[in-house]
Amino acid sequence: MGNNVVVLGTQWGDEGKGKVVDLLTDKAQWVVRYQGGHNAGHTLVIDGEKTVLHLIPSGILRDNVKCVIGNGVVLSPEALLEELKMLEDRGVPAKERLHISEGCPLILPYHIALDAARELARGDKAIGTTGRGIGPAYEDKVARRGLRVDDLFNMETFAVKLKEVIDYHNFQLVNYYKVEAVNFDEVLKQVQSVADLLISLVIDVTDELDKARLRGENILFEGAQGTLLDIDHGTYPYVTSSNTTAGGVATGSGFGPAHIDYVLGIVKAYTTRVGSGPFPTELYDGVDKLDPAGKHLGTVGHEFGATTGRLRRTGWFDAVAIKRAVQLNSITGFCLTKLDVLDGLEEIKICTAYKMPGDKLVDVPPMSAEGYEQAVPVYETVPGWTESSFGVTSFDALPKNAQAYVRRLEEITGIPMDIISTGPDRNETMIQVNPFN
């Protein structure tokens, strides 16, 4: 029988999932996206060539791997076309191996207009969305007014539904946000131009994945964003609009949850966050917090968002937040990324508890953003190392203090570091346990 493996982020996103998915797909026949949209930014470096994917699963760069966009993904036709063209310009025949669920909600221009208008209206309380219409598209889905891929099979009915939903949103855009209305004819024309392509990619995802499972094929589920951005379990309201945790796999793809064999949690050797929201171990944001160790993490780690281009906020490893990720996702093993970024630091800190109001010590995080904001990190300090760990592919070849750091993280989290990444390239990795074996 094959193995069904989930790869997801355990922090606030940007953990290095794209590289790991690409690495593991040499043993996978299918790679499935199950949540999010083109707000994801998965960076892959293969033989020095960098590719950033936002919507299409990272497995597309492997020959013979079928890639699926599941019903839990909100799909921007415009973003999909751009990505297909970029891949085809590089000689990757993406259309031949890409499939989509007809249950995918569509992201259309009025979603992007709403996203921008709302962030502007929030002023300094802005959530820090990517501005790509993700939240408003999920909102329409839950309100049952969203248009989906399956609506494209009847363009006459689609046009009627589109007119209703555009009228609904234009009322808000014009009268509340005082911005320009979205033009119905332009949106309809845009959708008509891509409808045939989208329809040609449709498969029954639940049925095809179940058949693949019964044939003993390996299926990899590729998460986007990170656990602490989950709509239900993250630092609400500074979260994304989908379930980024392992529970989202079943609802976002139609794959039975009992068939998942292994959950690989991607975790950076330190912590980063893009945009607004609480961050207990934060050291550096380029504005108010300017700790030199945090600046080192951001500079050496090239911490700029793959989707937004924004500087990421940086901080120490937060084992308290990670404990929640372990609980939420039933993590089997970790992949530790960017260990090499810590090279050259004299000492490294690990947050092992939060001090809450009243001097109460906790080892699991609060539920609310307000609770996170009140948390004061309690640190354990370990020695750093001066030797290079960059590109090292054997655990024993790592600097001794780097080995000790990895082992200490395993002790604190209770989860083995099955994979360790020491550089951006596919080859700069040590796989101690392969989830597909």
Curated annotation (Swiss-Prot):
Sites where the protein binds GTP: 13-19, 41-43, 312, 338-340, 421-423
Domain of life of the organism encoding this protein: Bacteria
List of residues binding substrate: 306-312
Cofactor(s) the protein needs: Mg(2+)
A GO term for molecular function: magnesium ion binding
Cofactor note: Binds 1 Mg(2+) ion per subunit.
Uppermost EC category: ligase
UniProt keyword list: Cytoplasm, GTP-binding, Ligase, Magnesium, Metal-binding, Nucleotide-binding, Purine biosynthesis
Intracellular or extracellular location(s): Cytoplasm
Residue positions binding Mg(2+): 14, 41
Gene3D superfamilies: Adenylosuccinate Synthetase, subunit A, domain 1, Adenylosuccinate Synthetase, subunit A, domain 2, Adenylosuccinate Synthetase, subunit A, domain 3
Biological processes, Gene Ontology terms: 'de novo' AMP biosynthetic process; IMP metabolic process
Oligomer and partners: Homodimer.
Function: Plays an important role in the de novo pathway of purine nucleotide biosynthesis. Catalyzes the first committed step in the biosynthesis of AMP from IMP.
Designated name of the protein: Adenylosuccinate synthetase
Organism phylogeny: Bacteria, Pseudomonadati, Pseudomonadota, Gammaproteobacteria, Alteromonadales
